[in-house]
Amino acid sequence: PSPKQARAEEAQDMEEEIEQVEFQTYVPHKLLKSMPDAKEHPDKVVENATLAAVESPDVDVERAEIRISKKVVEQGLLSGLQLETVVYAAMRHEKTLANGSRAGFALWDGAGMGKGRQLAGIIHNNWRCGRKKHVWVSISADLIEDARRDLKDVNEPKIEVRALNDWKASKKPTLKEGVLFVTYSLLISKDSDGKRRLDQLAKWCGKDFDGCL
């Protein structure tokens, strides 16, 4: 077959494989044992049967720093599925790597899961743990309004969100506590005097920074 025909056949084979995959409704069983009042996610969430066969890690609410407010749980400001992300992130952040760095958490949820609100939920939990400085990195400067909305949606309207470029690169941001919003492109930029935005951000965070990044 020609290259075009080969690609068409490959695409058809892939479609047939996808049709054969079995999907199951996802339920955060481990979380519900610790937070029985958690609400269902507003949209239907599924996972393929292979993933469903793998047991999720135990939720350790007692060991990890979990300070999620009752209002967030009982009013469904975060669904059970989103709360699960906040809890697993907190558990992961409790670990320290061999080089002394705090362990990170990767969120691979697909479209419609409310990832922005999940990130806001992680900040909400850390804020209530006493960590008052956080950095939100995004692809677009316009998404700062989404970050503000997401924090408001998890009952944190008083957390101030400011853009890093509200200040000149040579100046340390005067935001004492809150979320500093920065885009990837701004993060690698310099001003006309050669001052780097990354250095500016590092100065704001300080050596004792323990917030979300």
Segments predicted by a language model, with ranges:
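Short linear sequence motifs
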Residues: E16-E19
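Motif I (Walker A/P-loop) of helicase-class P-loop NTPases
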Residues: G114-H124
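The Walker A (P-loop) glycine that initiates the GxxxxGKT/S ATP-binding motif of P-loop NTPases
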Residues: D109
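SF2 helicase/translocase NTPase motor core
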Residues: K4-M14, Y26, L31-L77, R102-A106, ...
